[in-house]
Amino acid sequence: MSIKYLGLSEVNGPLVVLEGVKNAAYDEIVEFTVNNQEKRRGRIIEIYQDKAVIQVYEGTDGMSLNNTQTTLTGKPMEL
């Protein structure tokens, strides 16, 4: 089951921090919707309490703290 969040807490280089996260897992695949159209992917690389640090594969340029939609897919990274 996927869970969606609106907004980000912090953007720093290729990493973003999402607060208020529940039931997230290490290495979980994350999908971002930027400006209601562009899709990007990433994975959770650290979880602490209700915060998740996510590595964004396509970079964070143009990602808004207020309008970026984040979807936790509930699926681990697979090769």
Residue ranges and their predicted role:
Residues 1-4, 10-79:
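Acidic-enriched and Gly/Ser
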